[in-house]
């Protein structure tokens, strides 16, 4: 059970992900780089008690950033877009 909480790190909340939630019932999460689709599906079903139909994953590469004279890279991460069964919801924000 504790392993599942290590796999799913945080939800990704942007305008695009909000549209995905409203229109297609798809939720986006930042997950561990070593996680695979089967592990992500089991973790989400265990943590949120929902039925996950499909999981798509993507590795987000680090991006070069500059702030004045300082340069560096953002950290890369893996994100998972999970489609839930019809009628299922995950309460990510307090006002949902």
UniProtKB/Swiss-Prot annotation:
One GO term of the biological process aspect: translation
Keywords assigned by UniProt, alphabetized: Ribonucleoprotein, Ribosomal protein, RNA-binding, rRNA-binding
InterPro entries documented for this protein: Nucleotide-bd_a/b_plait_sf (IPR012677), Ribosomal_uL23-like (IPR013025), Ribosomal_uL23/eL15/eS24_sf (IPR012678)
GO cellular component, one term: ribosome
Residues passing through the membrane, by range: none
Record has Ribonucleoprotein as a keyword: yes
Transferase keyword on record: no
SUPFAM superfamilies reported in the protein's UniProt record: Ribosomal proteins S24e, L23 and L15e (SSF54189)
UniProt-recorded Gene Ontology molecular function terms: rRNA binding; structural constituent of ribosome
HAMAP family registered for this protein in UniProt: Ribosomal_uL23_B
Subunit architecture: Part of the 50S ribosomal subunit. Contacts protein L29, and trigger factor when it is bound to the ribosome.
Function: One of the early assembly proteins it binds 23S rRNA. One of the proteins that surrounds the polypeptide exit tunnel on the outside of the ribosome. Forms the main docking site for trigger factor binding to the ribosome.
NCBIfam families (alphabetical): PRK05738.2-4
Similarity comment: Belongs to the universal ribosomal protein uL23 family.
Name used for this protein in its record: Large ribosomal subunit protein uL23
Organism: Aster yellows witches'-broom phytoplasma (strain AYWB)
Taxonomic placement: Bacteria, Bacillati, Mycoplasmatota, Mollicutes, Acholeplasmatales
Gene (UniProt): rplW
């Amino acid at each position: 059970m504790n392993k599942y909480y290590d796999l799913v790190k945080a939800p990704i909340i942007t305008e695009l992900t909000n549209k995905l939630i409203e229109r297609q019932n798809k939720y986006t999460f930042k997950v561990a780089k070593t996680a695979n689709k089967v592990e992500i599906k089991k973790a989400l079903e265990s943590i949120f008690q929902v039925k996950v139909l499909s999981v798509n994953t993507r590795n987000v590469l680090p991006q070069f950033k500059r702030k004045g004279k300082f340069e560096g890279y953002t950290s890369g991460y893996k994100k998972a877009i999970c489609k839930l069964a019809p009628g299922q919801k995950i309460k990510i924000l307090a006002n949902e």
